[in-house]
């Protein structure tokens, strides 16, 4: 399995509908603390927008809803992984991505046989408080050796200018949140990301 080198993460279907038509091919819908009917509607809208643009949609956390709504890819954090029914996820045919922040979490993730692992934060991030220190690009090279051919996602503090650095140091995909969603011109920044990651999109 290959991931697009530009991995957009957003918190609403509005963002999906706004940015995916620009050429985004990999997007995660990460919504927190909303009622189930709202979540279902957000997933349905995001799924429709992604289907229209041939974009891979990944649902964060809500694996039961992802199964119910016919999605095919989910992402779980370490705490969510402990509570999830991996057998049910696999029976439903969903692909699985997992977050990791240290070697112990990587071992836990690899034991679950995911379809990709994410390492972060590579650089300091303003998105949320993190108990882990920034990993740096050096850790990416180490993770690359540990995971073998499995796709590796870098996340945390990545900008369009930094994306080539993580892709050159072992990551298959660079994940971004605030560099786009908090930019004064998210559409222009998305196009900059598409351009910055283009050399890796055409490889292979």
Swiss-Prot record:
The keyword Ubl conjugation does not apply. GO terms for cellular component: cytoplasm. The keyword Cell cycle does not apply. Pathway: Cofactor biosynthesis; thiamine diphosphate biosynthesis; thiamine phosphate from 4-amino-2-methyl-5-diphosphomethylpyrimidine and 4-methyl-5-(2-phosphoethyl)-thiazole: step 1/1. 2-[(2R,5Z)-2-carboxy-4-methylthiazol-5(2H)-ylidene]ethyl phosphate binds at residues 157, 177-178. It is an enzyme of class 2 (transferase). It comes from the Bacteria. Its EC number is 2.5.1.3. Mg(2+) binds at residues 61, 80. Pfam families: TMP-TENI. 4-amino-2-methyl-5-(diphosphooxymethyl)pyrimidine binds at residues 28-32, 60, 99, 128. CDD domains: TMP_TenI (cd00564). Binds 1 Mg(2+) ion per subunit. GO terms for molecular function: magnesium ion binding; thiamine-phosphate diphosphorylase activity. Its cofactor is Mg(2+). GO terms for biological process: thiamine biosynthetic process; thiamine diphosphate biosynthetic process. HAMAP family: TMP_synthase (MF_00097). Belongs to the thiamine-phosphate synthase family. PANTHER family: THIAMINE-PHOSPHATE PYROPHOSPHORYLASE, THIAMINE-PHOSPHATE SYNTHASE. This is Thiamine-phosphate synthase. It comes from Rhizobium etli (strain ATCC 51251 / DSM 11541 / JCM 21823 / NBRC 15573 / CFN 42). The lineage of its organism: Bacteria, Pseudomonadati, Pseudomonadota, Alphaproteobacteria, Hyphomicrobiales. The gene is thiE.
């Amino acid at each position: 399995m290959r991931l697009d080198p530009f991995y957009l993460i957003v918190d609403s279907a509005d963002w999906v509908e706004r940015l995916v038509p620009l050429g985004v091919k990999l997007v995660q819908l990460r919504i927190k603390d909303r009622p189930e009917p709202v979540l279902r509607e957000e997933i349905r809208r995001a799924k429709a927008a992604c289907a229209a643009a041939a974009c891979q949609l990944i649902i964060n956390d809500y694996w039961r809803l992802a199964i119910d709504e016919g999605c095919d890819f989910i992402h779980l954090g370490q705490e969510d992984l402990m509570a999830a029914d991996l057998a049910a996820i696999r029976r439903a045919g969903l692909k699985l991505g997992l977050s990791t922040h240290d070697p112990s979490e990587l071992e836990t993730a690899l034991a679950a046989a995911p379809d990709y692992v994410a390492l972060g934060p590579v650089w300091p991030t303003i998105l949320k408080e993190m108990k882990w220190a920034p990993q740096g690009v050096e850790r990416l090279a180490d993770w690359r050796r540990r995971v073998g051919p499995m796709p590796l996602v870098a996340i945390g503090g990545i900008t369009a200018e930094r994306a080539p650095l993580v892709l050159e140091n072992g990551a298959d995909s660079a994940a971004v949140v605030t560099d786009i969603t908090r930019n004064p011109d998210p559409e222009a920044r998305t196009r900059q990301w598409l351009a910055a990651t283009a050399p890796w999109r055409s490889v292979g």
